[in-house]
Amino acid sequence: MDVFKQSEVWFVIGSQNLYGPKTLQQVMDNAHQVVNSLNNEAGLPVKLVLKPLVTTPDEITALCREANYDTACIGIMTWLHTFSPAKMWIGGLSILNKPLLQFHTQFNAQIPWKTMDMDFMNLNQTAHGGREFGFIGARMRQQHSVITGHWQDKEAHQRIGQWMRVAAAKQESQQLKVARFGDNMREVAVTEGDKVAAQIQFGYSVNAYGIGDLVAVVDAVSKGDIDTLVEEYEATYRFTDAVKLNGDKRENLLDAARIELGMTRFLEQGGFKAFTTNFENLYGLKQLPGLAVQRLMQQGYGFGGEGDWKTAALLRILKVMGTGLKGGTSFMEDYTYNFQPGNDLVVGSHMLEVCPSIAKEEKPLLDVQHLGIGGKADPARLIFSTPAGPALNASLIDMGNRFRLLVNVVDTVEQPHPLPKLPVARAIWQAQPSLATAAEAWIIAGGAHHTVFSQAVGVDELRLYAEMHGIEFLLIDNDTTLPAFKNEIRWNEVYYQLNR
């Protein structure tokens, strides 16, 4: 999944004409060097494009208007090399609808103590030029990010890269289409929500399709295409005897391949990058899509079970954020606990649908086994465990007057014992700060039982994503205490009531 290749971030230098052509030319010469260095040496996921110097209100407004309509531009990164009076930026910033990053840097890393004169001081004015720019952002109540550090500093590079990933995720959010096969699982509350409010807030559209629409595409898949896909399965996974050629569940595997091909074509034809299924709405399908969903998630699609469109959209957004990073991202559900002093654990899984991007095994096991829910034939699925390491669980919930993004930092552990009778993929983790505190805080905050589990994306990216969209962000980690967490929820309730 290469979502960054066609994207760019515009690097914009603000100044004013009173400095004269010689100084302004030096500013642009320095900017060229900074941009070339960042593009070639910083490992940024998105290309920086240096734009012409802006020195007047009209130039700034024209540039912001152009950025809004350029589909390749996912955001603007500003540098106040000199002093740029911020009233000049009001018109442009008031219409800008792309993410904005202020890079508070300067060309020189250290002060040239022996040679510094007033010419040097006038040229290198980030220290106060950046504050002027920051004031107008604060005065306009406009969300914008600030990163401070020298342009050759690796920590600054990392933070710029994080911002770029989130800016790309916001762009994806604004054009994302989510398909719901069937409706919500009956009587379930948290998977419901205001789809119109979500489209206004995030940009993505959510629409439902009858299972018959999908079945028609599935039934049209040819035997030749099925055989080709099964050959891919055989090269990619370990097979149990039941699904090998002449195995007693071989036909179930062929049916699963047919469903995958049909779902893929339906999603591609409709331009969908996320989808949901529901085991209560399977009319016309021979089995619950398990293998198909797992493989589609690995290809970058978002997914939510039981009609959970919010989790499906969030999963796709995290897939975009985590592109090219180590670790995977998957649909997940807190399934069962291990209550043991000093070793409290959570087993995360789902009926079938866990993404192989988080698999520890190089070749997951492909099997067909009974599923006692849904009333259909035994479904195919990939079975694997998850490697140890840092991770998080994220949940997007509709609170009525706002959306809340809830995140719990967890530590994934190696599976402590074999699970010979558990025929599904799983992850096992220790919740921060403890299972008791994490679970109580999650429940108090109304967190869903479905989550997005990621070993690729971190807390900083998700906090920034929430800031870019103006939604609530709550974090449960090693610093969390329940009294403080409850107070934060109370304060947030007041803020969002007043900030309608």
Swiss-Prot record:
Isomerase among the record's keywords?
A: yes
GO BP of this protein: L-arabinose catabolic process to xylulose 5-phosphate
Between which residues do disulfide bridges form? none
Q: Name one GO cellular component term.
A: cytosol
Q: Which domain of life is it from?
A: Bacteria
Which InterPro entries does the entry mention? Ara_Isoase_C, AraA_central, AraA_N, AraA_N_sf, Fuc/Ara_isomerase_C, Fucose_isomerase_N/cen_sf, Lara_isomerase
Record's catalysed reaction(s): beta-L-arabinopyranose = L-ribulose
Ordered alphabetically, the record's keywords are:
Arabinose catabolism, Carbohydrate metabolism, Isomerase, Manganese, Metal-binding
Q: Which GO terms describe its molecular function?
A: L-arabinose isomerase activity; manganese ion binding
A Pfam match: Arabinose_Iso_C
Is Ligase one of the keywords? no
Query: So which cofactors does this thing need?
Result: Mn(2+)
The pathway this protein participates in, as annotated, is: Carbohydrate degradation; L-arabinose degradation via L-ribulose; D-xylulose 5-phosphate from L-arabinose (bacterial route): step 1/3
Instruction: Look up the EC number in the record and give it.
Output: 5.3.1.4
Instruction: Output the CDD domains linked to this UniProt entry.
Output: L-arabinose_isomerase
Task: Provide the cofactor note recorded for this chain's UniProt entry.
Answer: Binds 1 Mn(2+) ion per subunit.
Give the EC class as a word. isomerase
Protein residues bound to Mn(2+): 306, 333, 350, 450
Q: Which PANTHER family match?
A: L-ARABINOSE ISOMERASE
Functional note: Catalyzes the conversion of L-arabinose to L-ribulose.
**UniProt cross-references to HAMAP family, sorted A to Z:** Arabinose_Isome (MF_00519)
Record note on quaternary structure: Homohexamer.
Which protein family is named in the record?
Answer: Belongs to the arabinose isomerase family.
This one is known as L-arabinose isomerase
Gene assigned in the entry? araA
